[in-house]
């Protein structure tokens, strides 16, 4: 019965959205908040359909960006480092810091963290976790700034609201831009920051329209199409 109830709410909420229209970023954010059916502080997520062919190496898009107002989620950070770098990570506020001790824990099924950072000299060991961390999107990567000796900067940025983005096989990128409790202006600014970042990393080999379609939605709400020109 719960599903039917939720379905009814969703249908009512969806009626408020004109599926044929492309709303301005501000209007879209207002609609997303209005059509949110969740009883919790739902995440607001932006979805970009890009004119790229991810099968081609020169059209893969991956990186990270610090959102000006964060995501509303407190990220738990695990840092693989030793010696002075381990001390730096602890001082920066990392939740877990270690070298090989956490590798065994993870292999046994421990995942009480959201982001993994590793110093380059630890990647030989951390690489053993590729099969476990890779499918969960948790493997440290230089492109997202999570393989670095500057652990202080890495931890600070993650805690400040850094989000990773990666194009999937169909050419889509999904990124959280905050919570429904955020002020409209803050959600719009986060949204525009992501859009601007994706424009800057447009592959030179990408042909035709780059941002084909952009939508925004809350966790359990309907998608709202956005006029790309209002994200500039």
UniProtKB/Swiss-Prot annotation:
PROSITE patterns on file: RIBOSOMAL_L1
Pfam families for this protein: Ribosomal_L1
SUPFAM superfamilies: Ribosomal protein L1
An individual GO BP term: regulation of translation
GO cellular component: large ribosomal subunit
Molecular function terms, GO-annotated: rRNA binding; structural constituent of ribosome; tRNA binding
Assembly description: Part of the 50S ribosomal subunit.
Name listed for the protein in its UniProt record: Large ribosomal subunit protein uL1
